[in-house]
Amino acid sequence: MTNVLFIASVRPQLGVFADSVRKFRAAGATTYLAGTFPLDPVAEELAAMELDGTHQLPRNLNFRSTALRRKARMAPGGMKVWMQAERDSVLRRLARKADVLVALDAGAVYTVWRLAQYYRVEEAHFGLAPALKAVDRVKAKGPTGSRGVLPPLDVVKQNVRRSVDGLPATVMRHATARPVMRSTVGARMWRTAVTAPGVPPKVRIATSRYVAEGMQWAGRTSGAALALAAAASKLTDLGLKAQLLDEAVMKELGKGLNPRDLDKAVAAQLAHADAQFAAGDHEKASFALDRALFLGFHRVLHIDQLSSPLAKDAEGFVAPLYRSKVMDVMKRPQGRKTPAAPAPTDRPLRLLVTTSANDNFLHHILDRYGNHQGVELRYLDLAAQKALKRIAWAGRRVLEDRLAGGTSTYQEEVERLMRPYLDWADTVFLDWSVGPAAMLTTIDPGDTRIVVRLHSYEAFTRWPHMTDFSRIDDLIYVAPHVKDLVESLVPMLRGDSAPRAHLVDNAMDLSGFALPKSADARFNLGLVGISQVAKDPMWAVDVLRRLREKDDRYRLLLVGGDMNPKTSRATRDYRRQFDKEIAPLIEEGVVLKLGPTDDVPSALADIGVILSSSVREGCHVGLMEGAASAAVPVARDWPFYAGKPNSARTLYPEGWVVGSTEEAAKRILETTATEEAWQNAGKLASEYALSTWDWPIVSKAFDKLFLGEG
């Protein structure tokens, strides 16, 4: 009999594992499972598999030395598993008898290599498929077959020519040794090793991953990414190359860094997707394309930093994407079978307003048309129903359906769930051009008119590139500069099949913001909304410092919740720097954090100057509300759009927008020099805001859009 020992640090997928155990038993193997995950909750499932034995490994280090526990806290996950299991006598006995050792997950890999070294187990594997092949090899050797001896392997000085089955634990020990990886020489030698000629792909991949883990443990994140990318450059298999480059890029993105090999990683996924598409495997092609889009539009690149590759050359950034065969398929318009029917004249318009959870900009629209005699309104929150939420954000399935020519089960599911709503509605108004827009355009809308509103956020995501805009009749933009950006990014929006484009401001009831201000408000700067890196509140702090050099009466009031440090490492780093910057100012009473509020008008009553410090915006609602309250508006010339045909300077009146913190301080000092000057400037701003952006004005544009009125 061939003895097989499975080791797992997390619960395996029990269905898959059960099927595999049956295959191992059919091959004449005895099977044992040792795991650091809790075995008791799945005891019945494991018993049904008819394993020859199971063993619960220690789940923690509670009864070990303080020094070891301290070391474990700093160790990689795989090392921790080994620390827990290494002294377990049952595990050692099972390993001593094992012919094949199998790591069921990444956390168990290091333990398997250590056991393979100690007990000279020739067949040590990560994954079930290679382990099953190993059983056949052991059987073929017969009883005379002896275990191979694993000699030390100096991958720094020699070419690595052994198969991954014989890779010794020395590799892992060297790769995770911080002193070696902290050394420039050591790190360079390891990178040389992973690109050595003649190394089998499996060995190259395994070695590069261990090297990357060690470098990251030693604090060399970019070095870890470089090792993986270097190994990938030597691979010919498109799938493996794409996978390794993906891992390299994610190492840096996970630390909030701009990856040096992003272009290569995206190109590799696209090449893999094209190959799978050519082979007729639409599922694999969609997985690779989904990863390419995910990497190319990762939020760390475009949302959680103060700039984005799109700021320099948006069309150039997406050009390689659209040169691929799979994206050529995605950009082909499917169109609609019949044109949208005109609004009915013999009954109220049936208007379906829909979104997925985010209804921040819908309240006034719902209120108006819910009480309009010419409209029968229904509201659908896709996130409120589990089945609808599942299809609304199934990006990978959207891609597969398009690549398969609309023959997937996903389209059937969307048809079944969404057709009743489309059949009822004359017009569908979908807010936010994200997942639900991609979902909805996988099916023909019939004669229902489809209207979608795109704010600003969507431009920095992958969703517009997954949406068939030929099935959208009207696309609403909130500002000209957003329209320019999105049309430069999405080829379909520049073609004959593009929807009608409209520029309509967000629905805001600004009349309630005109509350009396105290004389002290004149010296209070305000920033409404600081929950995103793009708001760049550090710019506002710089303005405050410049003002206080002239007059120490100026203060800064921050309205809104803080940035969520869990969003990304880039967000966490900015939040940490910002908190450090304002801590002494808060102690002095110079900066006041008012936190989130449902009563923004009251908060603005204490603010005399409203700032827009952002690096990019669609239309900055906080600035518009502040202007309506008669606070003096001072808007940064948003760097993302500065100097372009449409920008903050074309969106707001002349004089509101400044090019630097110096200009901002100068404008504030001039407009607040006297109480009369401040009140006059605020009055003019309020009059402009109320006559331009207030809901009674903007609602006419929606009436015209939905009802053809006006």
Language model region names:
Residues 134-137, 336-341, 460-464, 503-522, ...:
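Acidic anion/phosphate-binding donor-loop and adjacent secondary structure
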Residues 570-596:
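Nucleotide-activated donor-binding/catalytic signature segment of Leloir-type glycosyltransferases, i.e.
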Residues 632-642:
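Short hydrophobic beta-strand element within catalytic cores of glycosyltransferases
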Residues 615:
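Aromatic "clamp/platform" in nucleotide-sugar-dependent glycosyltransferases that forms part
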Residues 512, 673-706:
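A charged, aromatic-enriched C-terminal amphipathic alpha-helix characteristic of glycosyltransferases
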